[in-house]
UniProtKB/Swiss-Prot annotation:
Keywords: Calcium, Calcium channel, Calcium transport, Cell membrane, Ion channel, Ion transport, Membrane, Phosphoprotein, Transmembrane, Transmembrane helix, Transport, Voltage-gated channel. The chain crosses the membrane at residues 8-28, 103-123, 129-149, 179-199. Belongs to the PMP-22/EMP/MP20 family. CACNG subfamily. It is a multi-pass membrane protein. The lineage of its organism: Eukaryota, Metazoa, Chordata, Craniata, Vertebrata. The modification Phosphoserine is found at S222, S225, S273. This is Voltage-dependent calcium channel gamma-7 subunit.
Amino acid sequence: MSHCSSRALTLLSSVFGACGLLLVGIAVSTDYWLYMEEGTVLPQNQTTEVKMALHAGLWRVCFFAGREKGRCVASEYFLEPEINLVTENTENILKTVRTATPFPMVSLFLVFTAFVISNIGHIRPQRTILAFVSGIFFILSGLSLVVGLVLYISSINDEVMNRPSSSEQYFHYRYGWSFAFAASSFLLKEGAGVMSVYLFTKRYAEEEMYRPHPAFYRPRLSDCSDYSGQFLQPEAWRRGRSPSDISSDVSIQMTQNYPPAIKYPDHLHISTSPC
């Protein structure tokens, strides 16, 4: 990454940030985080009969098999009596996964804020701090999302492990493409955050490289004291003062730094004349 130019880092961080924002937005708004299917095993020919199949998101549950086929309900109403779920574990899964909902929402807000700040920083690259701020927001957005994903997975695993085993019933579940989009957006947002922070360090190093060193500043005498705290750059020193002024200042400094000549009495004067 040390060989990447600032333009390449700007382009890559923008692309990664835009893709991360798009994927997490699609994931939050769609209903394909989890697929679940329940049924019974027929003992005669060992075939299965699907009793209920659904796909669930953060906001809705939609049934595509069973008695409720073709029906979608909001997540907070899936426990209504008229909805026929085969086992209580399915209800518990749909209930516990709601604890993970706030984290993807916070992640979506943070990545949107980071994307806006990042674009402002690209438009005005002289504001170096914006790249650093956007990188921090990208990283925080990814961390918030991964916390939500971990809670989502752990809630499902806990309910599946507590599910009683039965030879007459079966239960299958798998994660959908909305969940895959959310996981992919985590990688993209972390990548955008790392590149934004690196872009900040690169721009800051370039500013320090072209900034004049303090040793190139020289003091200027003021009217109120012999040593002034005001400083000018060498170019400004030569441009702002004429040669006669500079020579007069140098002569003043020399007279102030050297002691006056010693005067001897007249009677101690020794003549060097041969007469």
